[in-house]
From Swiss-Prot:
Gene Ontology terms: cellular component: cytoplasm
Domain of life from the UniProt record: Bacteria
Gene name as annotated: obg
Record keywords, A-Z: Cytoplasm, GTP-binding, Hydrolase, Magnesium, Metal-binding, Nucleotide-binding
Gene3D superfamilies: GTP-binding protein OBG, C-terminal domain, GTP1/OBG domain, P-loop containing nucleotide triphosphate hydrolases
Main location: cytoplasm
Source species of the chain: Ureaplasma urealyticum serovar 10 (strain ATCC 33699 / Western)
Every Obg domain range: 1-159
Names of required cofactors: Mg(2+)
Protein name from the UniProt record: GTPase Obg
PROSITE patterns from the UniProt entry: G_OBG, GTP1_OBG, OBG, OCT
Known partners and oligomeric status: Monomer.
Length: 435
């Protein structure tokens, strides 16, 4: 199975249900007044961090995800039901981008952290909502607000808590299979592992994911070999195991083998070499390994402690693992404390009372003269209210005209050269201009 760490999806939130015009019709109540209910809110789409997810594989074939629409309002002041929101569980370390602008919409790092990415539309108001002391029998209603429609790219930047890095055939696959349930393919050739292999262990009721990440070669930071596909996966690991083979058949120059990995990390991103890195020398049971170990120790000049193991025979693997996990818990505690200080657990956009996303609509308009007596007009404010106010009742026509007056619509058309009788198209409607 291919490892999926990036995918593109279209998210379509639900539209709000329409409000209605209705009247109270009861015996002995000659002037019952309005009784039209509001429409329900459309369903929104959320991404939720889930530590049980490890890949975006389950989204591979989901090109479009839709939320349901809110229900229409009903008679007797009955409101339409709100549609249920859609919650999509994704692995921790998932970053959500706007596919068009490349803007980061969500960076998900905490278990059960929720992000609203596509907001459902507000339900339209029924005529009861518009009743006032000045208008006791309003023939006013609204259509539901359109739900958001957005194409997003999901990229998994954190696939594991602990990453195992090293040159091809350092023994990473053998190591991870020695203490986890991972079953990687092993063989003596370059890039045996073409996708990250994940293995899991449990300590103190905590699940810890290890990743055998495909081997680095010189020039990986420029994209050579598996290049960036490898490096991006170690950016957010809590710590790294730098595995190096002591077998002279793998590395005739042990210092060069060590420095290749260190230099590639530095060239890609300096912060990588500042991570906790545990240097583990593997294949100590091979002929010539002790000589290579001594050369490596002299090169490092006691600046870095080396843990010596044989992954194949399981020599010293458990002791090495205990030390690594202790460092992991220390790093995780520091990381979680920083998140609590700087990030809210939930980032929730509140429903607005009358406009989408609780923001002020841009009232700027653009007027295009198509010919001598035909104009098209565009603008966020116009687009929103053209959809919300159906021009099917006299009261709605008056309300829509009030919206136009609030932005000096007629004055701007006159300045653009419009005269009485000209046709004015505003998105889906066409009006006759009156000075």
């Amino acid at each position: 199975m291919a490892f999926i760490d990036k995918c593109k999806i279209v998210l379509i939130a639900g539209n709000g249900g329409d409000g209605i015009v209705s009247w109270r019709r009861e015996t002995h109540v000659p002037e019952g007044g309005p009784a039209g209910g509001n429409g329900g809110n459309g369903g929104s789409i959320w991404f939720v961090g889930n530590h049980n997810e490890t890949s975006l594989e389950f989204l591979k074939y989901k090109k479009i995800i839709r939320a349901k629409h809110g229900e229409k309002g009903d008679i007797k002041n009955q409101h339409g039901a709100n549609a249920e929101d859609v919650f999509i569980n994704v692995p921790l370390g998932t970053v959500v981008y706007d596919a068009i602008t490349n803007e980061i919409l969500a960076d998900i790092n905490i278990d059960q952290q929720k992000y609203l990415v596509a907001q459902g539309g507000l339900g339209g108001h029924g005529n009861t909502h518009f009743k006032s002391a000045f208008n006791k029998a309003p023939n006013l209603y609204e259509l539901g607000e359109l739900g958001e429609n957005i194409e997003v790219v999901l990229e998994l930047k954190t696939i594991a808590d602990i990453g195992i890095i090293g040159l091809p055939n350092a023994g990473k696959s053998t190591l991870i299979s020695s203490f986890t349930n991972a079953k990687p393919k092993t063989a003596n050739y370059m890039f045996t592992t073409l996708n990250p292999v994940l293995g899991t262990i449990y300590r103190d009721q905590n699940r810890i994911i290890f990743a055998d990440i495909p081997g680095l070669i010189e020039g990986a930071h420029t994209g050579v070999g598996l290049g960036h596909d490898f490096l991006k996966h170690i950016e957010r690991c809590f710590l790294l195991i730098h595995l190096i083979s002591l077998d002279p058949n793998d590395n005739s120059d042990i210092i060069s083998a060590y420095e290749t990995i260190v230099n590639e990390l530095k060239q890609y991103k300096q912060s990588l070499v500042n991570k906790p890195i545990v240097l583990v020398a593997n294949k100590i049971d091979q002929i010539g390994a002790l000589e290579n170990l001594q050369i490596l120790k002299e090169h490092l000049k006691d600046n870095q402690y080396i843990k010596v193991i044989s992954a194949l025979t399981n020599l010293h693997v458990d002791a090495m693992l205990d030390d690594v996990i202790k460092i992991y818990f220390d790093q995780k505690k520091i990381y979680e404390q920083r998140l609590k200080e700087h990030l809210p657990v939930d980032q929730i956009l509140k429903w607005a009372s009358d406009t989408p996303k609780n923001k002020e609509l841009d009232k700027t308009i653009k007027i295009v003269k198509v010919d001598d007596h035909f104009f098209e007009v565009f603008g966020e404010y116009l687009k929103y209210w053209v959809h919300r106010i159906p021009l099917k009742t006299q009261d709605n026509l008056i309300r829509f005209n009030q919206k136009l007056q609030s932005i000096n619509f007629n004055q701007q058309l006159l300045q653009a050269g419009a005269i009485a009788g000209d046709s004015i198209k505003i998105y889906d409607i066409t009006l006759e201009f009156e000075e």
